[in-house]
Amino acid sequence: MPVKLAQALANTLFPALDSQLRAGRHIGIDELDNHAFLMDFQEQLEEFYARYNVELIRAPEGFFYLRPRSTTLIPRSVLSELDMMVGKILCYLYLSPERLAHEGIFSQQELYEELLSLADESKLLKFVNQRSTGSDLDKQKLQEKVRTSLNRLRRLGMIYFMGNDSTKFRITEAVFRFGADVRSGDDQREAQLRMIRDGEAMAVENSLSLHDESDDADVTMGNAADSVEDEQE
């Protein structure tokens, strides 16, 4: 085993960080120690994870994550359509002037209102009830599902709740996993809005896959197949 790889694996940070990466977490610059560790040992860890048929990726925005191949040896799971849509809205908010005005902090209510204003509400309600007529009960259930999606994305490192207040959160640069197609261009926010309204928030196989089940899904989101925590809701 190469000496520097041995040093990386022996580092006290590695066990917990390895578990987080395998669970689909994105490691951004806000996680100072973990991010610095990945920067220091990026080349060695790329070789290490290649043995499991996954790639250690450093995105243009600087965050790290694991991208599996179809033959990966690491268990995989996928995000739902609603998770994907919430992620797209988070990316849109990240690009908005309001993020600077609010010091990067948004509330769950603001997210929900933005979701309703940008996406087709009738389609959103289908996530709750395929035969939804737009009842108040269905709308309440939709709001609950949005909260569940937001919490799932938090575990993937897309947002951070503000202390013990789970109604407010800060968006991280990792949300660009949901906006790979808008990284270039004159108006990123307009491109993201177009993707949401055109239905492109729903990727192939209806999922942003952190541990996706096929190479086709790896192509969606600008070749950004992801690894998501396997959850039982």
Swiss-Prot record:
GO terms for biological process: cell division; chromosome condensation; chromosome segregation; DNA replication. The keyword Cytoplasm applies. Pfam families: MukE. Disulfide bonds: none annotated. InterPro entries: MukE_C, MukE_N, Scp_MukE. Its main location: cytoplasm. Signal peptide: none annotated. It is found in: Cytoplasm, Nucleoid. Keywords: Cell cycle, Cell division, Chromosome partition, Cytoplasm, DNA condensation. Residues 207-233 are annotated as: Disordered. GO terms for cellular component: cytoplasm; nucleoid. CDD domains: MukE. Involved in chromosome condensation, segregation and cell cycle progression. May participate in facilitating chromosome segregation by condensation DNA from both sides of a centrally located replisome during cell division. Probably acts via its interaction with MukB and MukF. Belongs to the MukE family. NCBIfam families: PRK05256.1 (NF003602). Interacts, and probably forms a ternary complex, with MukF and MukB. The complex formation is stimulated by calcium or magnesium. This is Chromosome partition protein MukE.
